[in-house]
């Protein structure tokens, strides 16, 4: 699973880079990591490691390591405690092969996920998801990004997700459901991604619906934060 894990980390770093760019924060990639030199937007890390064994000193030199700093430790092999960091959460990278279209119950895909195409639509999506100004209209103009929404019969937004394409992989993030049951959202994601190979990460109870949708785990990750 090491190749899938590295590919998932790279795709996630590309998504973080897209979000930061929309906020005027250009990121930098090299073989070790992706990073931004200034504080990233809320919920997003200041660095994402892209291989095992990245030296902590070199990684932290690329970011503002003061209070509020965060690092996505993609291979769960860093120890940032000596630098004042604590583990915020652990999670699992997930992967679903291309064209693996396991049938989902009809009730779960009766209302497919549809792309959000307008700034007003994105604002409405963000109001339900949470995050508000985090999701800026520039995301809709990027051909690599698709913001997905699921609507009830009365037009109410009931859930959604974000896809970001990079090479042969499509990343899945920001999966949510208003009623707390994301199973129908995960069930609709493979079709919305046109059968592409999918990667992402989830933790705790959020992992189970992804596994039911045909994903498998590809290794652990950790997110470190400095108080």
Task: List each language-model region with its residue ranges.
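A short, internal acetyl-CoA/4′-phosphopantetheine-binding micro-motif in the GNAT/acyltransferase core
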Residues: 49-54, 174-182
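N-terminal charged segments
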Residues: 1-66, 74, 125-144
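Acyl-donor-binding surface of acyltransferase catalytic domains
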Residues: 50-120, 188-189, 197-227
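Flexible, substrate/cofactor-facing loop regions flanked by secondary structure
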Residues: 107-174
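Terminal substrate-recognition subdomain of acyl/acetyltransferases
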Residues: 1-24, 34-39, 97-108, 138-140, ...
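A conserved acidic, glycine/proline-rich C-terminal tail/linker
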Residues: 182-193
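Short, well-ordered coil↔helix boundary/capping segments
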Residues: 166-169, 179-184
